[in-house]
Amino acid sequence: MGFSFFGLFGQNHNFKIVDVNEFAEYIKDTAVTVVDVRTPAEHAEGHIPGTDFNIDVLEDTYTKIATETLPKDKPVALYCRSGNRSKTAARILADKGYEVVELGTGFRGWVAAGKKAVKP
């Protein structure tokens, strides 16, 4: 990784919120697990290249599925449409001991910044 998590956590959360360019750089690392926490329908409309999983944070089973699916020994990079749902997902995973980075502006910010998206 290009940076250390030591001392990077904010007062109100124990995960790192990053901008589009930081997120793009972070997910270049193949050790990072990239998760889209939007609905399957939203994911099907387009997603960030390299996304490993689509686990809908609005589902009651999110925590169970995420903790059973995501390796705890690898950092997790989360995004949603605008950054709200992914913050919820990030709090859940960080509280479970995961190292989490969250795309503050979500997929909308990614697209608005001119980054590549996978579309059907």
Report residues per predicted region.
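Short, surface-exposed ligand- or partner-binding patches at beta-edge/loop junctions that are enriched
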Residues: 79
